[in-house]
């Protein structure tokens, strides 16, 4: 046990950077958040400015301590959780990026993925990395940068350039370029990492022509990686001692550390993870096999289903369609109609993730008749989040052989009671919403705290996992299956849309 009172979690997300201070009882003392720019150079392309990621994240760290009136010497450790797969390449000497960060949602590398498939790499990638061939993962993004920034591949071979996911980039900046590391959970999302041998995979590096010299060292999710100075020169040196990709951090924050426990996070995308313990379960149903954290941050495996558009489809209603002025209004408008009037929205704006994995699917609205109004479309958009979650859960139960009795949920959209009730209805299972919604930050804080003895073990934290509300199914099985079959019909029609274009 340390005499320091607080842990800081840095939660670097897709649309904002956050810092959260927690005390020993896992209470949230203070939160600071800053949004940053989304860059869309072409349709289907998504970028961030790595310097803006760093600027927003470092300023929230200073801000959150000031807000809580806490001095840096009261902080026991810092944990980091991050948007996964997003790829950054920078100069070792200057710490300057050679290109913008290519974000996980970006589809520009679809052609590179097609070539990997043509070269017969699909099965190898599946069995070695646990992933499917898709532009979502970091490997093809790094290749794209090296292919398009002149002279960069040669510089990378000479050790002048470094690659990292967002966790690696932040730690490099926080340690003034002294530490170049990532953790197993983030490495498992690159398509360059052998999840069984726990090492970078030479065959994948060769296939994508990525020099090994630019890759970070891979470490456990809970250990001291280095120190950062808060308050400039002569400030306090604080250990950075926890790293996990956002979804694995949420799984840990929900204390799903035993085989068969699962959670679904409703953020920009929707991510369901089920802990499968020490065995890597190969999916026959389009899910990913990935690395998660055991009770001490050690390597466990998980099955994951990723849905690209969840909260992002509500933002689409607000920003592009102008049907709502605030995301919170979606619940109000959805409940003004008794159903969707036969409408299904398939929000395949950047293709579809699990279990379809079709980068060429595109968004569509089906079942429109003259009586359909904006409330029906708002409701159908919310319902699409629950339908996509059922797609993933069905695949997960088939792969694992485990029937889920309750789903733990977290993320921004779980505040929407309509969505949570519909989710329970369409799954036919209990949905449990925790009291503390910041489970991603919680996971990063737990990992950091365990590494420095702030908490001795997870047993100390079990009683803190309080369920605020439980949703139970309120519709009959026949009704549930009827609605779901309509969804399946709609999805089928949205698949493989784009590749027919000239």
Swiss-Prot record:
CDD domains (alphabetical): FGGY_EcGK_like
Residues bound to sn-glycerol 3-phosphate: 14, 84-85, 136, 246
Cross-referenced Pfam families: FGGY_C, FGGY_N
Cleavable signal peptide: none
Statement: the UniProt record of this protein carries the keyword Kinase: yes
Pathway: Polyol metabolism; glycerol degradation via glycerol kinase pathway; sn-glycerol 3-phosphate from glycerol: step 1/1
Regulation: Activity of this regulatory enzyme is affected by several metabolites. Allosterically and non-competitively inhibited by fructose 1,6-bisphosphate (FBP) and unphosphorylated phosphocarrier protein EIIA-Glc (III-Glc), an integral component of the bacterial phosphotransferase (PTS) system.
E.C. number: 2.7.1.30
Quaternary structure note: Homotetramer and homodimer (in equilibrium). Heterodimer with EIIA-Glc. Binds 1 zinc ion per glycerol kinase EIIA-Glc dimer. The zinc ion is important for dimerization.
Name this protein carries in UniProt: Glycerol kinase
Organism: Enterobacter sp. (strain 638)
Lineage start: Bacteria, Pseudomonadati, Pseudomonadota, Gammaproteobacteria, Enterobacterales
